[in-house]
UniProtKB/Swiss-Prot annotation:
Keywords: Chloroplast, Membrane, NAD, NADP, Plastid, Plastoquinone, Quinone, Thylakoid, Translocase, Transmembrane, Transmembrane helix, Transport
Protein name: NAD(P)H-quinone oxidoreductase subunit 3, chloroplastic
Assembly and oligomerization: NDH is composed of at least 16 different subunits, 5 of which are encoded in the nucleus.
Species of origin: Mesostigma viride
Signal sequence segment: none
Length: 120
């Protein structure tokens, strides 16, 4: 028996999934109008002339809040399946989850003490 025998449909799906975006992007590039000018390189601001620079720097606090949100969002992602099958897992899985949660809580307390959650 060939070891990859059951993966035929996956390989076909993977090839099609790779070819569709490549063909769509290259096809649209081939049939697009080839016009260039200064208007094409200007930023679009609701049909009026652009005022000022288009480059805006965000404060680092936004990124800190986003990073902390992603961390705890991933925590929820891991805890939901565990909560569904909690009765079947036993005490070992419970202790592992307590260790996981304590590491995350220590990280939250560390970020809090460092002032990452303060907006001043």
């Amino acid at each position: 028996m060939f070891i990859l025998e059951g993966y035929d449909s996956f390989v076909v799906f993977f090839i099609v999934a790779c070819l569709v975006p490549i063909l769509a992007l290259s096809g649209s590039k081939l049939i697009r109008p080839k016009l260039s000018g200064i208007e094409k390189k200007m930023t679009y601001e609701s049909g009026i002339e652009p005022m000022g620079e288009a480059w805006v720097q965000f404060n680092i606090r936004y990124y800190m809040f986003a990073l902390i949100f992603v961390i705890f969002d991933v925590e929820t992602l891991f805890l939901y399946p565990w909560a569904i099958v909690f009765k079947d897992l036993g005490i070992t899985a419970f202790l592992e989850t307590l260790i996981f949660l304590s590491i995350l809580i220590i990280g939250l307390v560390y970020a809090w003490r460092k002032g990452a959650l303060e907006w001043s």
